[in-house]
Amino acid sequence: MSVLRSIPFASDIIEEIAGIIGNESSTGEGTVIVFPGKRPSLYLKARLATLAGPRAFFPPRCFSLDQFIDEIARRQNPGYADIDHGDAAFILFGLIRSLGAFERHALAGKGFGDFLHWGRHLLSFIDRLDMEGIENSALVNVERNASIGYDVPQSINELLSNISLIRSEFHRVLGEGRWFTRGTKRIAAVEETGVRVPDDLRRVVFAGLFGL
């Protein structure tokens, strides 16, 4: 069961979460805390240690949101590595040069240095689609409008008019290389929790969502 609890901005969120956890910190029972970033967990653990006093203290597992997604995504993909932006852009560059749909594309005959600027934008766009869970089937309007022409260079319109093809092939190459982008990591995490919720994640407190 999901419960949404509104905490006023003037309240001490660390104190509020410590109260939600209650005595679990002394028993090691499994509440997981997810903050927008890493630092709040340090304050929470310090507060719980103070409340525990001389008793044995087992702090709850705490994650930033990105760490939480990473933890879930790697359960079925333990050997995957995070790919950096330059390497990811180079994969996109290779796809533009090798896919038949881009045989006559202006960027297909240029070097990586000429492609890198737009490659980073293309990577960011694909990553955003993945992070927001947008399926290729929903990109029909983007591709249709790009065929008519957005207010960007024609070479970029040609890329966008085939964005679903680029994205599918990009995902394929990432899978073969056992690499994660931030977006594909999110996809893997959704797939992992889509069938069932792992036993150790039955009680998760997402705290400070206003900070996202």
What is each model feature region?
Residues 1-21:
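N- or domain-start disorder-to-order transition segments that initiate the globular core
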Residues 38-198:
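Basic/charged alpha-beta structural segments of nucleotide/phosphate-handling enzymes
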